[in-house]
Curated annotation (Swiss-Prot):
Protein name (record): NADH-quinone oxidoreductase subunit B 1
Function of the molecule: NDH-1 shuttles electrons from NADH, via FMN and iron-sulfur (Fe-S) centers, to quinones in the respiratory chain. The immediate electron acceptor for the enzyme in this species is believed to be ubiquinone. Couples the redox reaction to proton translocation (for every two electrons transferred, four hydrogen ions are translocated across the cytoplasmic membrane), and thus conserves the redox energy in a proton gradient.
One protein family per Pfam: Oxidored_q6
Main location: membrane
Positions contributing to [4Fe-4S] cluster binding: C73, C74, C138, C168
Listed Polar residues bias regions: 1-12
GO molecular function: 4 iron, 4 sulfur cluster binding; iron ion binding; NADH dehydrogenase (ubiquinone) activity; NADH:ubiquinone reductase (non-electrogenic) activity; quinone binding
InterPro entries, sorted: NADH_UbQ_OxRdtase-like_20kDa, NADH_UQ_OxRdtase_20Kd_su
Organism: Rhizobium etli (strain ATCC 51251 / DSM 11541 / JCM 21823 / NBRC 15573 / CFN 42)
Top class in the EC scheme: translocase
Record-annotated membrane-spanning stretches: none
Cellular compartment(s): Cell inner membrane
Length: 194
């Protein structure tokens, strides 16, 4: 077993690069013996060096806590997401009952004028950074009740929306895809300066 060399020369592992300075492209302290020794030690042990913001983004995407704001029939599809068939918790997306413990709010259903202040109050109670998923045609733009006098024509008039999930009602797979898109968006953008 093992790798056989093409020539009679023994196989040698690559030299460890250590911590790379992004401005120069060379290892940090490459001309300093002390830093060269530390870089060799870290590279030899298999350490991963990253920025703090990337570490926070990675941790945040794997531990999103969501709060339900089910207003109509879309809430039934939202509940299916936690059931064993889809089991959204395997993606690190767990439900919470309190807005003070949640990062994500899923607005599912028709938002009326009377309910809009409550939605804003719950949104304001969530800690930063906070994200909102608008689920279904009614939450996205009023849906079937768009021309009613008592319906808000899209919850983006009350709170900022990060992900729109279309459908009437959208399937649990569509909402799961929206959750995965939100995690991708969090990885792509910084959470500290949002």
């Amino acid at each position: 077993m093992g790798v056989t060399p093409v020539s009679n020369q023994p196989l040698v592992a690559q030299q460890p690069k250590g911590i790379i300075d992004p401005s120069t492209g060379k290892p940090i302290g490459s001309n300093d013996a002390f830093f060269g020794e530390i870089n060799n030690e870290l590279a030899d042990k298999g350490f991963l060096v990253t920025s703090t913001d990337e570490l926070i983004n990675w941790a945040r995407t794997g531990s999103l806590m969501w709060m339900t704001f089910g207003l109509a029939c879309c809430a039934v599809e939202m509940m299916q997401l936690s059931m064993p068939r889809y089991d959204v918790e395997r993606f690190g997306f767990a439900p919470r009952a309190s807005p003070r413990q949640s990062d994500v709010m899923i607005v599912a259903g028709t938002l009326t004028n009377k309910m809009a202040p409550a939605l804003r109050k719950v949104y304001d109670q969530m800690p930063e950074p906070r994200y909102v998923i608008s689920m279904g045609s009614c939450a996205n733009g009023g849906g079937y009740y768009h021309y009613s006098y008592s319906v808000v024509r899209g919850c983006d008039r009350v709170v900022p929306i990060d992900i729109y999930v279309p459908g009437c009602p959208p399937t649990a797979e569509a909402l799961l895809y929206g959750v995965l898109l939100l995690q991708k968006k969090i990885r792509r953008t910084g959470t500290i300066e949002r």
